[in-house]
């Protein structure tokens, strides 16, 4: 199946798995998806992720979701910002704050895929990929 927006597909799979209270979700892997999963793990939104290379022509990524003690998902919401039909770019000074700083913006910058506070410290702007809260 051809997917026009692989990042949007990744976010939708994570959102649906959280709503269904699944423990893991798998999807085709790419460098961008692995970088996003790494940021989500560092920021505490997911428990872990693994890249699976089982000899097929493509790799898959398995994300272990994180839940609170009362079984509420750690990820309350995900929103794709920059889409293939409408790219959204921001300067360093205009990096958006999500939910008053409780959420996270993920940006694709010249220095790689970074969280909003990392991009601020690195003094770079870039394409706003998504918001997570």
Curated annotation (Swiss-Prot):
InterPro entries associated with the record: Ribosomal_uS8, Ribosomal_uS8_sf
CC per GO annotation: ribonucleoprotein complex; ribosome
Any one biological process term the GO annotation gives: translation
Residues making up the signal peptide according to the UniProt record: none
Key words of the record: Ribonucleoprotein, Ribosomal protein, RNA-binding, rRNA-binding
Family: Belongs to the universal ribosomal protein uS8 family.
Assembly, per entry: Part of the 30S ribosomal subunit. Contacts proteins S5 and S12.
The protein's role, per its UniProt record: One of the primary rRNA binding proteins, it binds directly to 16S rRNA central domain where it helps coordinate assembly of the platform of the 30S subunit.
Protein's UniProt name: Small ribosomal subunit protein uS8
Protein's organism: Chloroflexus aggregans (strain MD-66 / DSM 9485)
Upper lineage: Bacteria, Bacillati, Chloroflexota, Chloroflexia, Chloroflexales
Gene: rpsH
């Amino acid at each position: 199946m051809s997917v026009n927006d692989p990042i949007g597909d990744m976010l939708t799979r994570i959102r649906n798995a959280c709503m269904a209270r699944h423990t893991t979700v798998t999807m085709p892997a790419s460098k961008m998806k692995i970088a996003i999963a790494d940021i989500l793990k560092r920021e505490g939104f997911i428990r872990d992720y693994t890249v699976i290379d089982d000899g097929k022509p493509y790799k898959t990524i398995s994300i272990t979701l994180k839940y609170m003690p009362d079984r509420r998902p750690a990820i309350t919401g995900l929103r794709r910002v920059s889409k293939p039909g409408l790219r959204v770019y921001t300067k360093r000074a205009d990096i958006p704050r999500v939910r008053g700083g409780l959420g996270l913006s993920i940006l694709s910058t010249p220095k790689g895929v970074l969280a909003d506070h990392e991009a601020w410290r690195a003094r770079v702007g870039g394409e706003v990929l998504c918001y997570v809260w």
